[in-house]
């Protein structure tokens, strides 16, 4: 599969299930994904997760990524669980409460991208659980 076609297929994925299916296909084809391809897959996962309904906005804030959770999600999330999760994944994260929204500030150093993907996946699970109660 030529690189351009591969990258286009990754960026055309609109849902995590599509991306996971493509990732499985690539692993079956190539074995371990080359670092460059893996980084593109990670970036696309992050982009897709940033469009979840519990996220109000995500901003690049000069050395940090700022994730603003919606007022609705901020009102019903278990703050202690969020605090524990964020502090387990990141060194020196910042949590703020602005205009009834929880804001998470994460330094964009080291393994910030895979850890942020893990954070967003966990928040997605919390959101889904709260909607089924």
Which residues does each predicted region cover?
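Accessory helical-bundle/CTD segments and flexible terminal tails appended to RecA-like ATPase motors
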Residues: 1-133
């Amino acid at each position: 599969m030529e690189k351009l076609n591969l990258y286009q297929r990754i960026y055309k994925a609109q849902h995590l299930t599509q991306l996971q299916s493509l990732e499985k296909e690539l692993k079956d084809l190539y074995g371990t994904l080359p670092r460059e391809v893996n980084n593109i897959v990670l970036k696309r996962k992050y982009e897709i997760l940033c469009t979840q309904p519990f996220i109000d906005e995500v901003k690049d804030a000069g050395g940090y990524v700022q994730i603003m959770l919606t007022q609705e999600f901020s009102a019903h999330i278990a703050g202690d669980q969020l605090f524990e999760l964020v502090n387990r994944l990141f060194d020196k994260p910042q949590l703020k409460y602005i205009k009834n929204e929880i804001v998470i500030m994460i330094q964009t150093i080291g393994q910030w991208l895979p850890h942020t993907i893990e954070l967003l996946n966990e928040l997605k699970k919390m959101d889904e659980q709260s909607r089924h109660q």
